[in-house]
From Swiss-Prot:
Usually encoded in the trnK tRNA gene intron. Probably assists in splicing its own and other chloroplast group II introns. Belongs to the intron maturase 2 family. MatK subfamily. The gene is matK. It comes from Amentotaxus argotaenia. This is Maturase K. Its main location: plastid. One of its GO terms (biological process) is mRNA processing.
Length: 509
């Protein structure tokens, strides 16, 4: 990948205009073939499902066959489109998809680099671990928050139109359109969600298309927010020349001319805008009146429709008042509460006492959602009654304890910044009893017998590291009034996605 990027910097214009020629390079096909062999060998233990004889001439003939196809069902033979996420399909079609993904990734990397260099004054932090500290420091200064959901279902022509803005190679666009229409079911919400949760699935092209689509949205949205943040409060009636003012507004807001009306227009007064995103969720913190925030929501709706030709449902952009509502983001219920603060100031012989009111972030762990997830995984039922894991009885005692220990430790590590640790201790109690019942079922005895035979060190050895971490993190939180964020996104990602999916269904209903 680095080698292709270095070559692309020398011949950037050539790559954008003649990307299709790179398909016939043997270096690219060899790299894709080796990558496919390595991935298949890691997933398939018994045999490798790829032919030992790989011919570059066959790949070229396959590309020529694709160009001559008229029926979209014959792209990769008479195969089922649902086999896009199946590892048992033809190796040559796999190589074509991998080669197309590599070429698009290289061209996309060069374009995104130039875009980030062109944005001055807008600080961008790409680490997922910086989201919660940023929200804790910056969001309390805002009074409204806009919760945006990026649509998962993407039409193939919308993706092709996006790539046409920075790729001028017609054969590559035709090949991309052919693949997208042949496998359009693979870019649905379920398959994209599966690709984000389970990276083992072969969904590299789907993830790249999703990331490029989100990047295209942000490439227009971030400059728009930047212009809003640097603008001043202006009133239409204060300008003697109304046409001159409308031209200024048209320059500030980058929407088409039909969106600008001659009515009174207010921009944000002392704007304070913060933008964070993870997955399909985006949060925009705003400071202003309710009317001003509604105007921003109106602009976002038109931004989505005119630039991406996509009808955005009203429930996908929600405006919440921070002092009265909460938002569900990354597995947390986020709310802000007013906190009184007394400040004493001494000047010469006078002592002044000032009462200040500040907003404080209160992240709450969704105990009911965690309980629902444990019930779904058959650790307990909906009411909280514990159930033994019969499928784990074939494991050793150490493996059983280690699995329960890992689940409990991951939950406490991720929700170390929450303000309701008592609910997490209840989740720990629910996990302890299934662990004991599983061991008792394995040894065909009761919990008391297992405890007596194994001794008191059976459960004290388990969850020991978790107990030390809990005591240290919560004591630090209460003493120094600082939260300890340990966002292990990789391990908690399936939990966050499942809870977010439940929350989305509640919002839609």
């Amino acid at each position: 990948m680095d080698e292709f990027q270095r070559e692309g910097n020398k011949h950037r214009f050539w790559q954008q205009c003649f990307l299709y020629q790179i398909f016939f390079g043997e270096d690219l096909n060899a790299m894709v073939h080796d990558h496919h062999l390595d991935r298949s060998s890691s997933f398939e233990r018994t045999e490798i499902l790829i032919s030992n004889y790989f011919s570059f001439l066959t790949v070229k003939r396959l590309i020529r066959r694709i160009r001559q196809q008229n029926d979209s069902t014959g792209l990769f033979g008479n195969c089922d489109p649902n086999q896009f996420i199946d590892r048992n399909r033809n190796s040559y079609s796999e190589s074509v998809l991998e080669a197309l993904t590599v070429i698009l990734e290289v061209s996309f990397a060069m374009r995104s680099k130039h875009f980030l260099e062109g944005i001055n004054g807008w600080k961008s932090i790409r680490s997922i671990h910086c989201i919660f500290p940023l929200m804790e420091d910056k969001f309390p200064y805002s009074n409204y928050i806009s919760d945006i959901r990026v649509p998962y279902s993407i039409h193939p022509e919308l993706l092709v139109r996006t790539f046409r803005r920075w790729i001028r190679d017609t054969p590559s666009l035709h090949l991309l359109r052919f693949i997208l229409h042949s496998w359009k079911n693979s870019f649905s919400a379920e398959n994209l969600q599966k690709a984000m949760v389970a990276p083992r699935e072969n969904m590299r092209l789907s993830l790249f298309l999703w990331n490029s689509y989100v990047y295209e949205c942000e490439s227009f949205l971030v400059p728009l927010l930047k212009r809003f943040s640097h603008s001043q409060s202006l009133l239409y009636g204060s300008f003697p020349n109304x046409n001159h003012f409308v031209r200024k507004i048209k320059h500030i807001v980058i929407f088409p001319x039909i969106n600008i009306s001659t009515x009174r227009i207010w921009l944000l007064k002392d704007p304070f805008i913060q933008y964070v995103r993870y997955g399909e969720r985006s949060l925009i913190a705003l400071k202003g009146t309710h009317l001003q925030v509604k105007k921003c929501r109106y602009h976002l709706f038109h931004f989505w429709q005119y630039y991406f030709h996509l009808w955005s449902q009203p429930y996908r952009i929600c405006i919440l008042e921070l002092s009265k509502n909460y938002s569900f983001f990354l597995g947390y219920f986020l709310s802000f509460k007013m906190k009184p603060l007394v400040v004493r100031t001494k000047m010469l012989n006078d002592l002044f006492i000032t009462n200040l009111i500040t907003n404080e972030l209160n992240p709450i762990a969704p105990i009911r959602s965690i309980l629902f997830f444990l019930a779904k995984e058959r650790f307990c039922d909906i009411s909280g009654q514990t159930i033994s894991k019969l499928s784990w009885t074939s494991l050793s005692d150490d493996d059983i304890l280690d699995r329960f220990d890992r689940i409990c430790r991951n939950l406490f590590h991720y929700y170390s910044g929450s303000i309701n640790p008592d609910g997490l201790y209840y989740i720990k109690y629910i996990l302890l009893l299934p662990c004991a019942k599983t061991l008792a079922c394995k040894h065909k005895s009761t919990i008391r017998v297992v405890r007596e035979e194994s001794g008191s060190e059976l459960f004290t050895k388990s969850f020991s590291k978790e107990r030390e971490f809990i005591s240290s993190s919560f004591s630090k939180t209460r003493s120094q009034r600082e939260r300890f964020w340990n966002s292990d996104i990789i391990q908690i990602n399936p939990l966050s996605n499942s809870w977010q999916k439940i929350q989305n269904k509640q919002v839609e209903n």
